[in-house]
């Protein structure tokens, strides 16, 4: 598919004043194609209702459509079960949920949380807050000149005091893509939980 054909699906680029525009802020939010806009309008016009809480026709329709999306995401991500797919408002809320509901109960004073020094605020601030709340230590994983996590140096940091590791797959700042499989395998050797911020990678990897 050609670039101009792809652009034709986005109303923003079809207006005369925007036909030559290039939108670079997709890491924050993307322009929406017409098919997405049409479906949102269709929802609000024809079956706007709460999901999973009512038995009326509208609610059943909304719930069915909602769960169908969950199934599609499961297939796209090759998840084992659709219950592994949890919808939130975005990556920032998701990471905060992990920090406060999963990591906080297992962390104590002087424990270590490892992150890369190239994280977006959404994958840095939650760990800074948690470290302050619990007395844990936040440490940065070493990176090389290509802004990639150095596996050999990372291995030297992994020990019984490290209780959690969090890193991005693809940086929305530099575009650097981590060797995420290697990092996960390395961290798992020490039975340490690891979280991957895959917000950028899911569309590009």
Language model features with spans:
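Pyridoxal 5′-phosphate
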Residues: 1-205
């Amino acid at each position: 598919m050609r670039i101009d054909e792809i652009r034709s699906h986005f109303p923003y680029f079809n207006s005369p004043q925007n036909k030559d525009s290039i939108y670079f802020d997709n890491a924050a939010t993307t322009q929406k194609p017409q098919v997405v806009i049409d479906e949102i309008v269709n929802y609000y016009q024809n079956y706007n209702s709460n999901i999973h809480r009512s038995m009326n026709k509208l609610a059943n329709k909304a719930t069915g459509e909602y769960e169908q999306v969950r199934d599609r995401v499961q297939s796209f991500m090759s998840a084992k079960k659709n219950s592994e797919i949890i919808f939130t408002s975005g990556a920032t809320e998701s990471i905060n949920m992990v920090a406060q509901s999963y990591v906080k109960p297992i962390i104590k004073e002087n424990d270590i949380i490892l992150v890369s020094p190239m994280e977006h605020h959404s994958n840095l601030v939650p760990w800074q807050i948690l470290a302050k709340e619990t007395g844990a230590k936040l440490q940065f994983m070493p990176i090389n000149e290509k802004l990639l996590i150095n596996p050999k140096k990372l291995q030297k940091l992994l020990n019984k005091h490290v209780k959690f590791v969090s890193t991005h797959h693809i940086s929305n700042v530099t575009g650097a893509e981590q060797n995420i499989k290697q990092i996960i395998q390395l961290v798992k050797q020490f039975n340490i939980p690891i979280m991957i911020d895959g917000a950028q990678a899911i569309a590009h990897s």
